[in-house]
């Protein structure tokens, strides 16, 4: 049992060398390219999920926004794979690190904003000042809209970090309680084990949902600037 509750969120190392890059590249092994004319069931499921997500996210985009299809699909598959990887025993979830999530959010957000200022600068600047704003409120609204714009990538990263971290903490706490109650009451420990099992199933759904939410928000930022 870990002495520190947050020890599971410390970046693992081997001989002082971080293993985070290896963990981040591991999901690529799960998405192999087909070697036969007839794909297996896993590959059929992958293609079906990619087509479904692509249809839902890219319907609102124009031709320029749809050029991001490969980026968005790679993003959602990467985040979902790393989230699910962290649910395995003795594993590590890279998305619990705020630095990594900010490193993903800021470049994507900045790319959409720069694309908006390059393609339609007047419309992008108009977002800072809604139409019909009273003159005394103009400076205040510009400051508020500017702050809200720069908060977007931070909120994107914090949302993913908080949801994944909270779920792992709950699993850790309930798992520790289950082990402690085994020597006290078998009935109570069985109930807590059932709760732990149901919570693990919920975390599987949360891992997929958070990957979808992160990618969907990036897609909405892209839609606003394309």
From Swiss-Prot:
One of its GO terms (cellular component) is proton-transporting ATP synthase complex. It comes from Osphranter robustus (Wallaroo). Keywords: ATP synthesis, CF(0), Hydrogen ion transport, Ion transport, Membrane, Mitochondrion, Mitochondrion inner membrane, Transmembrane, Transmembrane helix, Transport. The keyword Glycoprotein does not apply. Subunit a, of the mitochondrial membrane ATP synthase complex (F(1)F(0) ATP synthase or Complex V) that produces ATP from ADP in the presence of a proton gradient across the membrane which is generated by electron transport complexes of the respiratory chain. ATP synthase complex consist of a soluble F(1) head domain - the catalytic core - and a membrane F(1) domain - the membrane proton channel. These two domains are linked by a central stalk rotating inside the F(1) region and a stationary peripheral stalk. It is found in: Mitochondrion inner membrane. It comes from the Eukaryota. This is ATP synthase F(0) complex subunit a.
């Amino acid at each position: 049992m870990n002495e520190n509750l947050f020890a599971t969120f410390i970046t693992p190392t081997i001989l002082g060398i971080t293993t985070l890059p290896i963990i981040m590249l591991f999901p690529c092994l799960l998405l192999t390219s087909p070697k036969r004319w007839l794909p297996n069931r896993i590959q059929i499921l992958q293609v079906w999920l990619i087509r479904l997500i692509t249809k839902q996210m890219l319907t609102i985009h124009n031709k320029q926004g749809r050029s991001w299809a490969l980026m968005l699909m790679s993003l959602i598959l990467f985040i979902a794979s790393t989230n699910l990887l962290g649910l395995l025993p003795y594993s590590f979830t890279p998305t619990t690190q705020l630095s990594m999530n900010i490193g993903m959010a800021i470049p994507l957000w900045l790319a959409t904003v720069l694309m908006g200022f390059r393609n339609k600068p007047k419309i992008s600047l108009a977002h800072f000042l809604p139409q019909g704003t009273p003159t005394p409120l103009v400076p205040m609204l510009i400051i508020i809209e500017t702050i809200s714009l720069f908060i977007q990538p931070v909120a994107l990263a914090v949302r993913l970090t908080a949801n994944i971290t909270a779920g792992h903490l709950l699993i850790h706490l309930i798992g520790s309680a289950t082990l402690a109650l085994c020597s006290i009451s078998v009935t109570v420990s069985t109930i807590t084990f059932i709760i732990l099992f149901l919570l693990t199933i919920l975390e599987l759904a949360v891992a997929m949902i958070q990957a979808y939410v992160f990618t969907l928000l990036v897609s909405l930022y892209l839609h606003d600037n394309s």
